Amino acid sequence: MTNFCNEWVSYSQMIKRFLSLMVLNTVCYQASALELNVYLWEDTIAPSVVEAWHKKTGVSVNLFHFDNDDERSLLMLKSVQLPFDIMVLDNVSAFIFSRQNVFEDLTALPNRANNDPMWLQACGTHAVPYFWGSVGIAYRKSLFDKPPTQWSEVVDIAPAHRGRVGMLKDSVETLLPALYMLNASPITDSIDTLRQAYRLLDAANPHILTYEYVLSYVRSHPQTDNLHMAVSYSGDHYSLNRFFNTQDWDFSVPEGRPYLWVDCMAVNSVSPNTVQAKAFLDFLMKPDIAAINAEYIRAASPNYKARALLPVEHREDLSIYLPEQRLAEGIIDSELSAKNLSLRAKIISSVTYQYEAKP
């Protein structure tokens, strides 16, 4: 959940997919003002929260999903006007697009103050924190003697798991495991280090099952039993267990400084429904609503008043909330230079091209 690079995403394919989505769902800005269109990750809002909002206001909420931050960010860069009233985006993109005056100022929302200052600062003035978490490894407990504790386990893959590993296609997360293996920061701009990481990923490629986001992969592939573990985001294992109706999936944050993601919500300035959109975000930040949402999604809430309402087992779940010491050591997603992004884009393009060319 991080920065974007636009060289390795097929823009034409994305636009075809996006237009199909619009046709199928008849999304347009001529739609009723009693509808809000929200662009977000899969499985990241509780149905009961959407129902409670509709019951209270009469305003419907239409949900549209993206698979990775780069896909969403490229679409935003290339499109003059998007048919979404509200967008979920990483903290880096929130600042980038806020500088372009495409989002509404949200500092006046009353319930914004319910969030911890750390996460408010991460999202800035034109977005509000929605959830946060860490990048780690989702894995099937029945197939492992012990949880994965090293990032090398998804790069230098043990024979039993070869061809069964999922990666992420993202300008930071794709390279992250290899960079940690090299004792480097996942956001390093060292050309030599990035090239070393490329060589590690290239060697791992024959043993990678997919570069598709794990939640999207299991929904779109019938042979989901092939997947043993995947680079993923905290909370994803709960979605996997819900999807498979099992308790086999778990989540591990390997050793080293945790890499933290922050999801923010923003209101599109060209939306005709900015009043309702802001009201919806304020509704989501009510402590009781934020608590319901966090418990359903099984993600870390930035809302300290909501956390006080959550069950003890949620607050003490170390797969959701990092221990304080590890949180203090965490690296929060930050903006990469154009040169860094360009090199990463070339690396990822080469890695995924070689992956797709596998026999």
From Swiss-Prot:
- Give the signal sequence positions: 1-33
Which SUPFAM superfamilies does this one have?
Periplasmic binding protein-like II
Q: Where in the cell is it found?
A: Periplasm
Q: Where are the transmembrane segments?
A: none
Would you tell me the protein name for this molecule? Norspermidine sensor
| One Gene Ontology molecular-function label | polyamine binding
List, in alphabetical order, the GO biological process terms annotated in this UniProt record: polyamine transport
This protein's GO cellular component annotations are: periplasmic space
Primary subcellular site in the record, as a coarse category: periplasm
Question: What superkingdom does the record give?
Answer: Bacteria
